[in-house]
């Protein structure tokens, strides 16, 4: 009884900690996006004024070198829904609004949107900011960040082993261009620094047993908890956290 209470307390504390890390990252992503959307050089990029040496990739590199955010992506879309710049790839000039419902909504009714979503590259934090020039709506800036700073924090500072498994619903769309290129039993794994040991262990198990965890599970000397990653009432992924019970205080 005492032991189960202890495990319940640890689980509850971890859930609070991780939800707090997620909210912090969401807000930081929004702060970067809001600042950048006001920048005149960002606005000029919509008009393809590439003769300037302004490149958001350099900002992404600076964030990588000086902050915990190692893979910040910037995406600029014009007011007709065409992608004019992606910092992480050379791909551009595609009419992205044709396959993005969220974009169609914002182009019709420009407003700030801050969310977690799954695209063709990854599960990401995404802040979408309408851009105006001389009070005229000219496009959208997206600032996109990943879950890796959160899972690194859990591994390095909390001594936990996290793995993020994106819902099977999104597996097919992630196959070709996924950020981590890691798949486990038909699930996309979203954290680059996932432990090989955990991958091997889960590959030998019935994954569904872990994805059904409501509170916690004790198995093979591990305390395992599952934190669903939700957006607008839809489950996008499960974050499983492993902690060796022999290392618990």
PLM regions: where:
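Juxtamembrane extracytoplasmic/periplasmic/luminal helical "stalk" adjacent to the first N-terminal
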Residues: 1-48, 65-72, 156, 160-162
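Juxtadomain coupling helices with adjacent low-complexity linkers
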Residues: 151-181, 246-249
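Conserved beta-strands of PAS-like sensory domains
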Residues: 123-156, 230-248
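Short hydrophobic alpha-helical segments used for membrane anchoring or interfacial signaling
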Residues: 34, 74-80, 162-170
């Amino acid at each position: 009884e005492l032991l189960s209470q202890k495990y319940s307390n640890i689980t509850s504390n971890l859930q609070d900690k991780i939800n707090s890390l997620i909210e912090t990252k969401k807000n930081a992503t929004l702060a970067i996006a809001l600042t950048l959307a006001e920048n005149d050089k960002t606005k000029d990029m919509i008009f393809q004024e590439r003769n300037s040496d302004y490149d958001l990739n350099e900002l992404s590199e600076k964030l990588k070198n000086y902050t915990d955010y190692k893979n910040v992506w910037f995406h600029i879309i014009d007011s007709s829904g065409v992608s004019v710049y992606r910092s992480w790839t050379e791909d551009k000039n595609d009419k992205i609004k044709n396959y993005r419902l969220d974009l169609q909504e914002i182009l019709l009714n420009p407003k700030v949107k801050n969310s977690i979503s799954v695209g063709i590259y990854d599960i990401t934090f995404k802040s979408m900011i309408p851009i105006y020039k001389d009070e005229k709506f000219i496009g959208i800036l997206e600032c996109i960040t990943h879950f890796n700073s959160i899972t690194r924090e859990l591994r390095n500072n909390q001594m936990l082993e996290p793995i993020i498994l994106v819902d099977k619903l999104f597996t097919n769309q992630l196959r070709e261009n996924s950020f981590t290129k890691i798949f486990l039993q038909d699930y996309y794994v979203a954290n680059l620094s996932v432990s090989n040991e955990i991958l091997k262990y889960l590959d030998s198990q019935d994954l569904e047993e872990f994805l059904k965890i409501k509170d916690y599970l004790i198995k093979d000397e591990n305390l395992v908890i599952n934190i669903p990653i939700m957006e607008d009432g839809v489950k996008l992924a499960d974050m499983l956290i492993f902690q060796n019970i022999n290392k618990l205080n």
